[in-house]
């Protein structure tokens, strides 16, 4: 009997092409599954999932596959969104997409796959998995502009055992071409960007609904003079340049640190200012796809779009954290962000960055 693959369909072109490829090129029975993680709609309907679900219906109809919907709104709020708010209120810059992958897409969704009798879960992530003969390892996607292994570095290894990433070896251009050729209803749909529960709204206007504004000083760290005011230190992240609204300087201003107790945002002038660069950090909440003891040197990404940085991993007596020492200074290392570790194409694992918020 042919095995069953459940496709996580978002209503976008990527997951639509995944369903199409599995339906037309494999013997699997294909089922579509739409996951709803957010209930609230703002007055403009910017966070509405209705249009996405309609697109899933249209593509499933084109492919003649059954489809279902599941709501994890309650669990998402508890496991992802509540933590997002807690971390931001403390001054950290969390990555909810990494947490969503670990807690929702590759945990709760996996349980739903089993309920539907599925043998595999397929998603539209631009990642690859090594063959079973080599052991199950997460690899970068072939298209460096779309590689999403960074967002899966916190996902438990066992959660990937039955996962398929059909797009991992393709470029986005190729995926679009397949959608056009197949005349899929989502072929022309634009990619979604940003944090899913914020939608197209300005980040600040969304966050202030949940974390109260508290005005404070913006201080030039070098002169220790007050140069401006802010509405909440939690709105600012290390390395940020936009939104400071500070004039009177030939050099651009960058956020270099925060004092959450005193509600102060510190800035420096010039992108080459030494306080913007650090050579070490601590990584906590670690997740490994390989034995961590075997890792001494590797490369790391300290944010999604950053370049790989060569580094040394210094293990401690605490299994829950490691010290990371970079070969060269790295700009704007941000507490709360995700760090992903690599050995060439292989993702070794990841963790959460812990560094001082105050300049030093």
Swiss-Prot record:
Q: Which residues form the active site?
A: 100 (nucleophile), 196 (cysteine persulfide intermediate)
Instruction: Tell me which Pfam families the record gives.
Output: tRNA_Me_trans, tRNA_Me_trans_C, tRNA_Me_trans_M
Does the keyword field hold Repeat? no
Q: Does the keyword RNA-binding apply?
A: yes
- Per UniProt, where does ATP bind? 8-15, 35, 124
Can you list the disulfide-bonded cysteine pairs?
A: 100-196
Where is this chain's protein located in or outside the cell?
Cytoplasm
EC number(s) of the enzyme? 2.8.1.13
Broad EC category: transferase
Q: Where is this site: Interaction with tRNA?
A: 125, 337
Family annotation (Gene3D superfamilies) = Adenine nucleotide alpha hydrolases-like domains, HUPs, Translation factors
A GO term from the CC aspect? cytoplasm
Main localization of the protein described in the UniProt heading: cytoplasm
Protein name from the UniProt record: tRNA-specific 2-thiouridylase MnmA
Source organism of the structure? Chlamydia caviae (strain ATCC VR-813 / DSM 19441 / 03DC25 / GPIC)
According to the entry, what is the taxonomic lineage of the organism? Bacteria, Pseudomonadati, Chlamydiota, Chlamydiia, Chlamydiales
Q: Which gene is annotated as encoding this protein in its UniProt record?
A: mnmA
